[in-house]
Structure formats: C-alpha cells, structure tokens
Amino acid sequence: AARGAGDPHRLAAPLAAAGRAIAPALLALTLVLPFLPGVGRYEIDLGILVLTYVMLGWGLNIVVGLAGLLDLGYVAFYAVGAYAYALLALNFGLSFWVCLPLAGILAAFWGVLLGFPVLRLRGDYLAIVTLAFGEIIRIVVTNWVSLTNGPNGLSGIPRPSFFGLPFSMSGEPDTFAGYFGLTPSPLHRFIFLYYLILALALLTNWVTLRLRRQPLGRAWEAMREDEVACRALGINITVTKLTAFALGAMFGGFAGAFFATRQAFISPESFTFIESAMILAIVVLGGMGSQIGVAIAALVMIGGFELFRDLAEWRMLVFGGTMVLIMVLRPRGLVGTRTPSIALGRRRTIDASLVGEGR
C-alpha cells in the first residue's frame, strides 16, 4: 500500500540528508568558535555548558533513543562521575587524566547495578524505578557527611593541567603560557576546557555511531521496537539492556568528572531531578535516536535559557510553551524518525510476464 503524505518514513531520507548537511558545518563552527572575532570568556563558557549537555544527551540517547529504556534518573550517573573524580583527586591526589576513566568505569558499574533489578520492567514502571534511583543517589551524597561533606559539598577540587603544565598567570617556564611562550591569560584555561569537553563529546558520538551499525546497536533498536520479538529471535535481552545502561552511564560519568573539575565545587543541589528532566527533554526534543538532533536541541535549549535570562521567572514559561509548540509541530523531535540504522531495501513488484517456466 502507498504511504500517506504524512507518514514519517517518507521524511526519513530528507531529514537524514539535512542532518548530513548540517553536521559538518556545525562541527566546523564548533572547532573554531574560541578564535572567532568578538568571542570572549562568556561565549566560551557558554559553549562549554552547551557541549556538556550535548554529551549528556548523547549518553542518555543510547538508553532512551536507541534501546527504548525510559530513564528518569540519568543525573545519578552524572553525580557518581563528579563525586568519584572529586574524592579521588582530593583524597588520593590523582590527576584528572587518571580520575577521568575511573569515574566513567565507576558510573558504568552503577549502571549495571541499576540494570539488573529493572530487567523485566518497561514503560512507566521502569521510569518510576530509575527516578527513584536518581533520588537515592542524591539523598546518599546529601546524608553521607563524613565522605561527601553533605549539603555543604566539596570545594577545592583540582583543575586539570595541560599534561602537567598548570594554567598559571605567573608566566614561569613550567606553566602553560611560559612553556609555549604566550602571554599569560585566564582565557587559556577556558579554551582548554572547551576543547576538552569537545573531545569527550566527539568520543561519545563516535562510539555511539560505531555501535549503531554493530550487532549490539541493531539489537538495541530491535529491542526498542519489540522486545518480545527480540526474545523470539534469540537476542540476549539481559546483555542488551545492561550494555545500554552501562555505556550510557559511563558517558554520564565522564561528563560528571568534567563538571567537577570545571566548577572546582560540587554539591547535591547540582544533581536534582530537574537535571534529569532537562537531559531527557534534550533527547526528546532533538529526536530520539538522532545524534545531530540532540546536538541541535542542546544548543537551542541551553542557548535559549541564556537568551531569556533577563525574563527571570518568565523564562520557564517561555521554555515550556516552546517545547509544547515544537512537540505539536514535530512529534518525533527536530530530527527524529526512529528508522533503523540498517534497513532492508524497498520491495518492488515483479511483472507477471517475467515469472514463468524457464525464467
């Protein structure tokens, strides 16, 4: 049967083509942003914030967009990564480059721990359990005062250096500016942090795109569409779900470690349900399963919050109204089609004259 004009599958090719056209231009702009005329500390810091949410969105996109597992407690892994880095750096003196993978591994471990109890849950029940998990982590870091300093948070978290070269204004030979013969500037650290989170975000994107075309990625998409059919086909649902939770949590842990080193201070108030809702909104607005859509949504949402900062209490109303309008006009998100990464070719009818004996 012919597909209707409004069928989302008819839009898959144009949207994919648009995404392929936008992505290189967006990447090129991102790469040169710190060196564009008129760009200063505020713009670079805003870029860092946007890229942090892009990375978080891509991490959650694995769980929600590809595997179809509604996770309302993703901020828990963000918190685990942040506190893991802070505690390792403060208590053991480990460098950022050592703590970063450890924070990701620890967050992935908690992702697996969350995954086991919810293996048989779907939809609303899964959402409730993940929401509770996110709140449990926040309550634990709030009340475990001897370890996390409770609601007062952890301060004095070490900032990363450029492979042993600190970003100091002294200009000494053993500093970043002195080693490269540059005039000391506070912008150097911001530019370094900008490219650091950009590299982490691109790593997240590269791993996700590679996995989507692997058997594991196809299993995620198949499970998203029909879990019962997946079981009938012999797909190991347990492994498929746990890997989605673990990988999504790992990237959330990386982002959390970066957040801790960027802020040099963390507290439980930074990891509330509002953060989970914001990240989920980015994934839904961009289009579940769409990498470029999530990036555009993060830019629109975080940039929009800054744009309407002067509206104070009204900006949430503007944000909510805009979200409703976009969801009415684009129910599948800005660049969302939910088409599989690898699909069978289009079926064609065969003329009856070509079917016969000897042909």
Ranges and model annotations:
Residues 62-81, 120-126, 265-272, 291:
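Short, non-helical or kinked segments that cap or interrupt transmembrane helices
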Residues 226:
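Phosphate/pyrophosphate-binding loop motifs in nucleotide- or prenyl diphosphate-using proteins
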